[in-house]
């Protein structure tokens, strides 16, 4: 975290400013990714993007133009590709038949998870984070992108199913963070920042009164 503090402090001293019109983009090295892992990354984003955008409090104007959600028809086609598909085939599906990998400002770059960046410069890009000069939030954003990237690489398969925003979104998203491996004191501050915009009880899915064992324990302690 000290590294992030020094870097953010350097930006501030250089005159950096942020506002609601701009975002923070996180690039992750894509050299370890395969067509299957990129398919996984898109599927994870599709599944979690509704609650993710709520957790990140993404500016609606940015969502409409600069960090759109996953294109469902495109993902459906990519998920139907055979497991041994090539990167060239995946690239054609991402660009919907053409090859825009040589274009800096190709239209497919304006998505929360940007695979154009993979084909253009070799990095997987997340564009959904709000701009900030808070070192803790910067670290949380980068850590989340790295964790999703790692899960996409390590996971053998994924499903294309939206995660519903339940009556307790804080618990739902915390569960996702724990499944990504963001567990323990090392990631406590990361979880705090990523959960700060979500209502609900982070530790309990339902009202504590609905758990008989917990109620019995309380009665015994009286």
Language-model-derived ranges and their functions:
Residues 3-4:
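Short, small-residue-biased leader/transition segments that mark boundaries at the very start
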Residues 11-17:
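Catalytic micro-motifs at enzyme active sites that drive phosphoryl/nucleotidyl and oxygen chemistry
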Residues 17-33, 121-127, 174:
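Histidine-centered divalent-metal-coordination microenvironment in nucleic-acid enzymes
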Residues 17-19, 50-67, 150-165:
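Flexible helix-coil linker/hinge segments at domain or subdomain boundaries
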Residues 27-37, 64-71, 167-171:
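Short, conserved secondary-structure transition motifs
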Residues 39-130:
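Aromatic/basic-lined ligand-recognition segments
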């Amino acid at each position: 975290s000290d590294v992030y503090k020094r870097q953010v402090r350097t930006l501030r001293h250089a005159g950096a400013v942020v506002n609601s019109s701009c975002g923070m983009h996180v690039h992750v090295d894509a050299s370890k990714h395969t067509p299957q892992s990129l398919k996984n990354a898109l599927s994870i984003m599709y599944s979690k993007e509704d609650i993710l955008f709520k957790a990140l409090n993404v500016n609606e104007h940015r969502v409409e133009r600069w960090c759109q959600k996953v294109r469902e028809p495109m993902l459906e086609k990519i998920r139907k590709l055979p497991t041994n598909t090539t990167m060239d085939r995946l690239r054609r599906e991402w660009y919907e038949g053409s090859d825009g990998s040589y274009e800096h400002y190709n239209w497919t770059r304006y998505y929360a998870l940007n695979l154009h960046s993979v084909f253009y410069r070799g990095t997987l890009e997340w564009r959904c984070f709000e701009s900030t000069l808070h070192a803790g939030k910067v670290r949380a954003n980068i850590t989340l992108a790295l964790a999703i990237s790692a899960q996409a690489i390590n996971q053998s398969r994924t499903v294309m199913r939206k995660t519903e925003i339940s009556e307790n979104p804080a618990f739902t998203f915390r569960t996702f963070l724990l499944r990504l491996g963001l567990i323990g004191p090392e990631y406590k501050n990361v979880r705090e920042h990523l959960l700060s915009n979500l209502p609900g009880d982070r530790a309990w899915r339902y009202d504590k009164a609905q758990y008989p064992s917990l109620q019995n324990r309380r009665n015994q302690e009286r």
